[in-house]
């Protein structure tokens, strides 16, 4: 746990304590392997913006290198458009609205970036349950990334999701949301969700940023968290965490966009594939 800002020793200690509390519960709930090192950083809003823009560009660069050179002009245009959109809202996100973000590195490690100002404005620090939810959520992304072994095929799928509509973020965020609810239930006797906070309890800074037309427009699309949770919850109930974890190493099990809209279809396909694998019957292609 690093405090790159050098200004928040108490918050650093608080996050370290919560990490110690939630780590075994996240491991137990996900049935996934823990990384050998878990990196959490407290950073400034400016550093968050710079790191997030660099992460976005790295995904596009990976996608670009996998495609024919004749597609480069279109991909370059998409990158410029995405970066322009990001920079329009970045000060509102990194400094106010985004409580935490996790990026996969080139090794088997990931890094979670936390902005102290955003934690305060969003109400995360108002109750220990909300900080525990956030840390459990972001830690789950570390385990997801390790489960894929940061393999090129998975990274390619994530990169391509930037330039076309994909389902991978619904899976990742829905899974992490499901886990953070389970972890807070284990810790506090009931699930806790920062999203349930009344807007009247949020800071004026947060409410103003949240009402900004650019943010309202950005949020007019699909809700990664709610739709993702609606996707993952029935799958967990049907096949269990250990079986669901096969999706991290088998891209054929990834939900389609249609299955995100209709989770029962994904659950049925998972059950068929798992049943086929269990009986040793030949697996169909496609």
Where does each model-flagged region fall?
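N-terminal low-structure segments adjacent to metalloprotease catalytic domains
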Residues: 1-75, 144, 263-286
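Acidic/His metal-coordination segments adjacent to aromatic residues that form catalytic metal sites
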Residues: 121-125, 157-165, 209-218
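Solvent-exposed, acidic/flexible segments
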Residues: 12, 128, 132, 169, ...
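Post-HExxH zinc-binding segment in Zn-dependent metallohydrolases
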Residues: 130, 134, 145-196
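A structural signal for well-ordered alpha-helical segments within the folded catalytic domains
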Residues: 17-20, 137, 170-174, 226, ...
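Pan-zinc metallopeptidase signature
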Residues: 186-286
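Active-site scaffold of zinc-dependent metalloenzymes
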Residues: 55-132, 139-146
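Generic structural signal for hydrophobic core residues of well-folded globular domains
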Residues: 139, 143, 147, 179, ...
């Amino acid at each position: 746990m690093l405090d790159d800002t050098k200004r928040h020793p108490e918050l650093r200690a608080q996050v370290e304590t919560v990490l110690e509390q939630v780590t075994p519960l996240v491991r137990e709930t996900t049935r996934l392997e823990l990384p050998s090192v878990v990196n959490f950083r407290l950073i400034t809003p400016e550093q968050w913006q710079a790191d997030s823009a660099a992460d976005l560009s790295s995904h596009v660069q990976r996608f670009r290198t996998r495609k024919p050179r004749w597609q480069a002009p279109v991909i370059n245009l998409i990158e410029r458009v995405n970066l322009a959109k990001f920079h329009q809202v970045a000060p509102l996100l990194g400094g106010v609205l985004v409580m935490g973000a996790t990026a996969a590195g080139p090794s088997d490690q990931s890094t979670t970036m936390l902005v102290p100002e955003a934690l305060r404005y969003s109400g995360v620090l108002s109750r220990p349950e909300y900080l525990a939810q956030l840390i459990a959520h972001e830690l789950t992304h570390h385990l997801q990334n390790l489960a894929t072994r940061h393999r090129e095929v998975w990274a390619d799928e994530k990169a391509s999701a930037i330039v076309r509509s994909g389902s991978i973020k619904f899976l990742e965020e829905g899974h992490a949301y499901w886990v953070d609810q389970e972890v807070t239930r284990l810790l506090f006797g009931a699930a806790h969700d920062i999203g349930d906070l009344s807007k009247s309890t949020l800071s004026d800074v947060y409410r103003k940023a949240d009402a900004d037309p650019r943010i309202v427009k950005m949020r007019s699309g699909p809700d990664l968290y709610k739709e993702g949770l609606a996707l993952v919850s029935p799958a967990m109930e049907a096949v269990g965490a250990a079986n669901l974890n096969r999706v991290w190493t088998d891209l054929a099990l990834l939900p389609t966009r249609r299955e995100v809209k209709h989770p029962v279809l994904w659950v049925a396909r998972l059950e068929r594939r798992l049943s086929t694998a269990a009986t040793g019957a030949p697996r169909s292609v496609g």
